[in-house]
Amino acid sequence: MALVHLLAYLYLAYLARVTGPLAIDHSVREFFRTSQHTTLGWMLKKWAVFGDWQMLSVGLICLSLFFSPEVRRRFLLFFLLALGGGGLVGQLTKMVVGRMRPRDARLGFPSGHTIAAMITVCGLLYFGARSGVLRRPVAWGLSAGTGALIVLGVGVSRMYTDSHWLTDVFGGIMLGVAVSTGVAAAFEERVAARQPMADQRCQGGSVCGGE
């Protein structure tokens, strides 16, 4: 999954660099520009907090305090690698692509808020599933659906406020999925590699998980 989303992200970045904003970018921008609403606009602007890197970092650190030391270490390491790596790749892509935002001269592709939101949602789902909290399909479905709505809301917020093009948001989603699933796969490989060592320690009369 990580490779598929990474390839899709690179292709979209190529299009953004070569063609600039696509026709659909202009159409979606015009739609939001003609659909401004005072109350809705206020809500959407506030919704962008779910993609704010600093707020998410503080929230994740606070959440980790409820975990055991071992889980806390893995949890914080995951998000350090995923958010840090995603942010770095995103900034490098902005410089390589060089496409401006709709309303100002800042680099726009991909949307950093969307990257952060997507990585956070994917990471929380990963740890929820691994811990068994989301072992039931209903719990998984509700959590994944809620996460998707949060990410979608962040993306809409960035377009509604004329901060990003539609393809900026799509790029952020694809990069977020690629990075988070890639880090999760690396974590799983590390666990699988350590398992034979644990089994070897269980041999020779050691007690492991029972008599």
Protein language model regions, located:
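Membrane-embedded catalytic cores of phosphoryl/pyrophosphoryl-handling enzymes
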Residues: L60, P102-E211
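Alpha-helical transmembrane segments of multipass membrane proteins
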Residues: V4-Y9, G86-G90, V154, G176-A184
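Interfacial segments of alpha-helical transmembrane regions
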Residues: M1-L3, L60-G85
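Hydrophobic alpha-helical transmembrane segments
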Residues: A48-S68, G128
